[in-house]
Amino acid sequence: MKKYLLIIFSFLIFNLAHAGMSNNDKSKAWECSGIYMANYFLPPGESFEYSMKEKSMASVKVLKSYALEIGISEKEWDDGVNKAVDKYNGAKYDKVKTEDCHTFVNSAIPDGEERVKKVVQTLY
C-alpha cells in the first residue's frame, strides 16, 4: 500500500512541477519571443527606442530561462522560438503586440518584471 501511495505522490509532484506553463502559455511565450526578436532586428527606417530593444532582448532571455527552470527542454524551446522568429522576421514594430507581450511576461513568470529589469542591467 505504501508503494502505491509513493507512486501516486511522485506522479502528482512531477505534474505539479511541470504545471508552470500550459501549452497555451508556451505558444504565447514563443510568439512573444518572435515578436521581441523582430523588434531587436527591425528593418532599416523603422523607428524604435533603444531602451525597448534592450527590454525585448532581456525578455527573450527571461522567457527562455523560465522555460528551462520549469522543465521544458532546450531543444523544444529553441524549436518553438525559431518558428516564431521565422514568422515575425522583418516585421514592422507593433506597439500593441509588444505591450501585450510585456503584460504576458509580467503575469506568467513569477517576478517577471523584476527579472527583465535585472537582465537589462547586465546587457552592458
Question: Language-model features: where?
Answer:
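Sec-dependent N-terminal signal peptides
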Residues: 4-15
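Compact alpha-helical subdomains of small soluble proteins
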Residues: 50-124
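Boundary at the C-terminal end of the N-terminal hydrophobic targeting segment
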Residues: 17-19
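Short N-proximal segments of mature Sec-exported proteins
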Residues: 22-72
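Charged, amphipathic alpha-helical interaction segments
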Residues: 15, 37-38, 106
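Residues embedded in well-ordered secondary-structure elements
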Residues: 21-22, 90
